[in-house]
């Protein structure tokens, strides 16, 4: 049974649409998504990638941005059918750590995209 689950996850990973993009923590990303109910409405989300978790079968990323005076963190599954497009806009300067959780304690001007 376990072998069957692993093979299904490996097939899902191979079918991934966003495997071509090489996303690293510290990248400034723009993600285009669609809504469940209204398929015509597309939404652009921008933010700094503060963490990547690679699991068997799927990969999640966390985006952080400062919008309207409030810090927001959102997590996305890259293999999700909601995500239409991912673009890498640029990179932030600073540490070369794998996780950029130290940005939570920094000033809002450093988190703003």
UniProtKB/Swiss-Prot annotation:
SUPFAM superfamilies: Translation proteins SH3-like domain (SSF50104). GO terms for biological process: translation. Keywords: Mitochondrion, Ribonucleoprotein, Ribosomal protein. GO terms for molecular function: structural constituent of ribosome. Gene3D superfamilies: 2.30.30.790. It holds the Pfam family Ribosomal_L19. One of its GO terms (cellular component) is mitochondrial large ribosomal subunit. Its main location: mitochondrion. It is found in: Mitochondrion. Belongs to the bacterial ribosomal protein bL19 family. PANTHER family: LARGE RIBOSOMAL SUBUNIT PROTEIN BL19M, RIBOSOMAL PROTEIN L19. This is Large ribosomal subunit protein bL19m. The lineage of its organism: Eukaryota, Discoba, Jakobida, Histionina, Histionidae.
């Amino acid at each position: 049974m376990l072998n069957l689950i692993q093979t299904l996850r490996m097939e899902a990973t191979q079918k991934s649409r966003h495997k071509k993009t090489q996303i690293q923590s510290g990248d400034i990303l723009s993600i285009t998504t669609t809504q469940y109910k209204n398929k015509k409405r597309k939404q652009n989300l921008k933010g700094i990638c503060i963490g990547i978790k690679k699991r068997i079968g799927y990969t999640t990323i966390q985006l952080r941005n400062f919008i309207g005076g409030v810090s927001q963190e959102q997590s996305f599954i890259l293999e999700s059918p909601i995500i239409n497009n991912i673009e890498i806009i640029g990179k932030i300067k600073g540490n070369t750590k794998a996780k950029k959780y130290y940005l939570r304690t920094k000033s809002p001007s450093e988190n703003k995209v």
